[in-house]
Regions:
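Glycine-rich, acidic/polar active-site loops that bind/position phosphate-bearing ligands
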Residues: 1-174
């Protein structure tokens, strides 16, 4: 983890040139913006904005009908993307890049967007705390490897995908 002051020092020393300000979408993917690092530390760390359709799309980034908060009928507006400066960290898989997680707030009154995943989690943690309980979390990453490229899978509607093996290989060591 880095403090904002440590991030500024890393940027000044040219060890960081990009800051990714990201939030989880409804599918758990990180969405957000990439900032030139000097621009971020000079003021973008306060807040930025994004379109609220980002919490109302499918895996192909197509708007899904039926959402109360955002739709073609209601219109798509902006929300505030507010960096949580306690989450700044280096992004080891991207050279010279830092990552900061963000909260989503209403564009007009800066209240938390109730259906944003981080805000849902915060409310649940507050409920646990009120009951004198504490949550512990861990990730279990599971995935499938397919023979097709992303482009081929998309073109085929994600149907009839094939795996490199005919076996289910979870938990296999060899």
């Amino acid at each position: 983890m880095l403090t904002l002051e440590e991030l500024k020092a890393e940027v000044k020393a040219d060890r960081i040139d990009t800051v990714v300000a990201a939030f989880p979408d409804m599918l758990g993917r990180l969405m957000g913006k990439r900032f030139e690092a000097n621009f971020f530390v000079d003021g973008a760390f306060e807040e930025t904005h994004g379109c609220n359709y980002l919490l109302a799309v499918d895996v192909d980034m197509e708007p899904v009908p039926g959402y109360k908060a955002a739709s073609w009928e209601k219109g798509y507006g902006d929300f505030v993307i507010k960096p949580d400066l306690a989450t700044i960290r280096l992004c080891p898989w991207v050279p010279k890049t830092a990552l900061v997680l963000c909260d989503l707030l209403d564009h007009h009154d800066h209240s938390p967007i109730p259906h944003a995943p981080r805000n849902i989690l915060k409310r649940q943690l507050e409920r646990l705390s009120a009951m004198k309980m504490k949550a512990y979390f861990a990730s279990e990453l599971e995935f499938y490897v397919f023979d097709q490229s992303f482009k081929e899978a998309h073109a085929g509607g994600y149907r009839t995908l094939t795996t490199p093996s005919h076996l289910n290989e979870d938990y296999n060591i060899l």
